[in-house]
Amino acid sequence: RFAAMTRFSPVLPIAFGESRFQPVYVDDVARAAAEAAMGETAAGIYELGGPEVASFHDLMVMMLAEIRRHRLILNMPGWMARATARSLSVAQFMTAGLFTNSVLTLDQLRNLSHDTVVSPGARGFAELGISPTPMALILPTYLWRFRPAGQFEAIKESARNLNGA
């Protein structure tokens, strides 16, 4: 959603930019679930997180670098983000659903207001014998479409190399 916003806005507003996340690749989670379903793991609760921990702000910086766009990241204060979310929710209610608030909800703000990382000492991928996939391997596979030239960006870059030779 944030990558799509960069197509039409010079500013990327975020809330709680200091909150930390540990993004995980869905295929790694699916592999862990498959092993659990097959009875190949010890019973219990596992917290699954990727190999890197980054702040929400830093994740936005990584995304902007990957899509090759420069935007001002504006970290809104919590009160402003809550007011925005409430206003959007009221607009959805007042229009009887004609306007759907897919921009910012109070639930999203609650999730953003605290760290979402694996707890210290929690069982995770290591206990399952799975090495989680780094973000750098996955981000290009789905963010390329948000680059200025989309799927043709690689062609443009190779042509630029030919012209410079």
Regions found by a protein language model. Name each.
Residues 20-27, 46-66, 75-86, 131-133:
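Substrate-binding strand-loop-helix patch
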Residues 33-37, 63, 142:
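Hydrophobic "lid"/C-terminal helical patch
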Residues 7, 38, 68, 140-144:
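Residues at helix-coil transition
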Residues 79-165:
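A hydrophobic C-terminal alpha-helical subdomain
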Residues 2-3, 60, 113, 139:
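Conserved protein kinase catalytic domain
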Residues 4-24, 28, 32-49:
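A conserved pocket-lining segment of Rossmann-fold NAD(P)-dependent short-chain dehydrogenase/reductase
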Residues 36-50, 69-74, 101, 149:
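Core catalytic loop region at the nicotinamide-binding pocket of NAD(P)H-dependent oxidoreductases
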Residues 1-12, 57, 65, 70-71, ...:
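Acceptor/aglycone-binding surface of glycosyltransferases and processive sugar-polymer synthases
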